[in-house]
Amino acid sequence: MAYEIYIGDRMFSSWSLRGWLMLEKFSLPHKVQLVGLYSGTMAQEMAHLAPARLVPALRTPEGTVVGESLAIAETLAEQNPDAGLWPADPAQRAAARWLAAERVAGFSALRSECPMQLAHIYEGFETSGAVQADLDRIETLFAGACGVVC
């Protein structure tokens, strides 16, 4: 049996992209259910799955529904321990979880001022101080992570 992942358009929704990408990257069998993220139908389409009516939402082969990227990651890791979703080493795994949590909850200026739109080329964008601070933090996190997680 396969997982079902409920997402919006991966070109415009980083939340949707994250949910789908975990399944793709680790070759876990899945079926994509696209919901109307921008058509106004998402809340109705998601009502039977998730009280928050947000994407992504995952239905496991057993029928359990899980929302939120990190909860989905944890569920997939538990159900597929050999897939390598998290590092095997406890210290590396803790660092990876920290990075993932900060990615989900942090960088508000970057998300606010730089919406995800993979089909558009932005020219002449001037980085605000807040966005630059987020970018600097990302560089610091990933530079440090390669000594711990990579």
Show the residue positions of the predicted features.
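GST-like domain detector, emphasizing the conserved glutathione-binding G-site
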Residues: 1-128
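Amphipathic alpha-helical packing segments from all-alpha helical-bundle domains
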Residues: 126-146
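Short, structured loop/turn "capping" segments at alpha-beta junctions
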Residues: 107-111, 144-149
